[in-house]
Amino acid sequence: MTNISSMELGCDVVTEKPITTDERKAQRIIDAQKKTGRHIRVAFNYRYAPHHTKIRELIRDGVIGDVFSVHFEWLLNTVHGADYYRRWHRNKANSGGLLVHKATHHFDLVNFWLGTEPDTVFAFGDLNFYGKQNAEKRGVKDFYYRCHGSEAAKGDHFAIDMDNNPTLKAMYLDAEKDSGYIRDRSVFGDDISIEDTMAVLVRYKNNVMMSYSLNSYLPWEGFNVMINGSKGRIEYHAVERPYINAGGDKKNEGATKTYEIKVYPMIGEPYIVPIKKIEGGHGGGDPVMLEDLFHPGAQEDEFHRAADHVDGIKSILTGVAANKSIASGMPIKVGTLVNF
């Protein structure tokens, strides 16, 4: 693992999310960090987006009182969402599935907003839309292995044409002779082992409850978050721009088209919360995070957005526990997965 070998060579580490994909590898990172004393930063850019930071501020300032429950719904559309089923992510042994690879962002946000960590997780998950069997149920008859060179792919809305995208062609198609990696698999193949429909229940250590859903075949991309407390409710709605990963337009990755945070006081009129807009990927979070990563401590951060390996591992453990719950049909105690 690159994180571990870097620390063993005496380096501090900056890593993308997810920090890893299962509890065994997470424990190895914990042990290596203790042994080497090196520092790990996890690049959780969503923490730095102004609208996400605003939620932490509202909760911190007691605007809705003590938080009791959260409902978090994430929607992936058939551009970005479908892309996970073309690539290496379609194999759960590689990616941990979307509950680890994608939802680590969302689970980290909840940990960050509430200042807590998961205690117990229960989940359901199925592959209902993607995959050959599901396509056959809908009457699809023309199947193909990959888009490149396939006549059947030309009429498929879900096919990705790397020949006509210079960035994808150079990065993947032209490199196949060296890498052996095929980037444009059919999303209706018969060897997909990740889910596309997921529902998760989480009890946190501070007794807050969360219901979470993730679906990856929907007409629009974005999320709805509802946070309920002793003095009111926050409703947070966002629509994001769809994109193809590594498709050449970096600024659109996670870029927000529209968003609104609305507070509903228990007594009084609801109101929309003003948010300062910052240009950049992931809702304006990328430039703020990069400044913090490469100039740490230049400015004091009242929201403590910098994430270390402990934050990174706690974010994946919700998804790891959810995967175990889907497989076993039982609730999972998160504290049994690793030792910090």
PLM-predicted stretches and their roles:
Residues 46-185, 293, 329:
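Predominantly a Rossmann-like dinucleotide-binding segment in NAD(P)-dependent oxidoreductases
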Residues 20-21, 47, 77, 219, ...:
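Glycine-/small-residue-rich active-site loops that bind phosphorylated ligands and cofactors
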Residues 194-340:
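C-terminal helical cap and adjacent loop that interface with cofactors, partners, or active-site loops
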Residues 7-8, 34, 60-63, 115, ...:
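Residue-level signal for alpha-helix termini/capping positions
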Residues 94-101, 187-188, 276-284:
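A short glycine-threonine-serine/GTX helix/turn-capping micro-motif
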Residues 1-47, 62:
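Beta-strand-loop-alpha-helix segment that lines the small-molecule cofactor/substrate pocket
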Residues 152-211, 216-220, 238-240:
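Contiguous C-terminal substrate-recognition/catalytic subdomains in enzyme active sites
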Residues 1-4, 27, 49, 53, ...:
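A structural signal for well-ordered alpha-helical segments within the folded catalytic domains
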